[in-house]
């Protein structure tokens, strides 16, 4: 291995899963593991086999299916843990046993009720036992960030002598600051005589928001493995996020001494979305690298800069992580340059419209609606302001019966006519969608559906957002209500009205 290669050790399936309200199923874990393999992760920590039969089987199945990544299993410094880890891993093409014990005074005295010599003896014995199964053994000094430095140096030296090939230095509770954590790694390299016989790894938690910073500071002092998770999943405030350290290393090679990883960065975004969907853990909109706002621009000044040169406000190209869609949001903060560019993208020559007039009407619509979409802007070109927000479809009444056969009855006003339909579906939301499709005689495909709480308490409002695809174009709808089914119906009707206006625009174009 080249000295500037940073090994990426992903622990989404072990440490990340510990943050979830419920355990993942075996097939869900396998799906994530295969995605991590496709991402180019070097080491996948698949689980903690001794913790449950389900975890054992999951590690075993992942070990049998993944061929290009090393599969790792966690164990305490106990014979039964190490033996169980081996039994789960032995079918793997490449595997690692990862054993650990706490080394801080606080943990030794209050949790383990043992002194340092006892802990040292247990660690060495565990490493030797793990080495009887594989040459690839990792040892972690739990709570290393709060371990007296002389004790930590002595533990690391003896763990390497016992046969550990990777020594992991965790900031278990996210307590240290980057300069402080970097100094710990620096001292280890200066004081541990056999440090060159092992790879030094770091595992940083995010309790003070320092996980990524601590990990990067550590590689500058000699660490060559970073333990991380997709989307920063993990106990409490989470772990170092894989996408953050990988893109920091890629983006700041000038400062980070030419370090690199083998991660296929173009797969980062889809892997992030997959993990979010399987774990049911939403990605915060402002999350670095993969959040929905990470490459979004709504300020007119920022949009103007990006339109002239993306590097003015984007240090990473969205395509670098696999995002290929436009994230320029049209809001009341957008300037004329943004509106002109959007119209050009829609195929309109600037000689065919008055930009000042369109922009004035755009601002009125944006103040009323919030976010304006390209089809809304196009409607401004052909429909008068009084009519572009005129809704052909109005939801009048809605009733739903749940149970074995979910059924919805929807009444809608179309112009002056009332139309009612009743439909079944695979759940009440689909039943409502089927009713609206039948009433409108339009058959779009539902591409995205999300629910977010807008307030708290028993009378909390929920916001439903939907994306419908019709004739190759996506249309967005939003609904808000204390009743999620009603909010869903509102969102569907909103999107259907956008489709209607789009069809009306097409008619005007053909006239």
From Swiss-Prot:
InterPro entries: 2-IPM_HCS-like, 2-isopropylmalate_synth_dimer, AIPM/Hcit_synth_CS, Aldolase_TIM, LeuA/HCS_post-cat, LeuA_allosteric_dom_sf, LeuA_bact_synth, PYR_CT. Keywords: Amino-acid biosynthesis, Branched-chain amino acid biosynthesis, Cytoplasm, Leucine biosynthesis, Manganese, Metal-binding, Transferase. One of its GO terms (biological process) is L-leucine biosynthetic process. It catalyses: 3-methyl-2-oxobutanoate + acetyl-CoA + H2O = (2S)-2-isopropylmalate + CoA + H(+). Its cofactor is Mn(2+). SUPFAM superfamilies: 2-isopropylmalate synthase LeuA, allosteric (dimerisation) domain (SSF110921), Aldolase (SSF51569). Mn(2+) binds at residues 15, 203, 205, 239. One of its GO terms (molecular function) is 2-isopropylmalate synthase activity. It is found in: Cytoplasm. GO terms for cellular component: cytosol. Residues 394-511 are annotated as: Regulatory domain. Catalyzes the condensation of the acetyl group of acetyl-CoA with 3-methyl-2-oxobutanoate (2-ketoisovalerate) to form 3-carboxy-3-hydroxy-4-methylpentanoate (2-isopropylmalate). Homodimer. Belongs to the alpha-IPM synthase/homocitrate synthase family. LeuA type 1 subfamily. This is 2-isopropylmalate synthase. The lineage of its organism: Bacteria, Pseudomonadati, Campylobacterota, Epsilonproteobacteria, Campylobacterales.
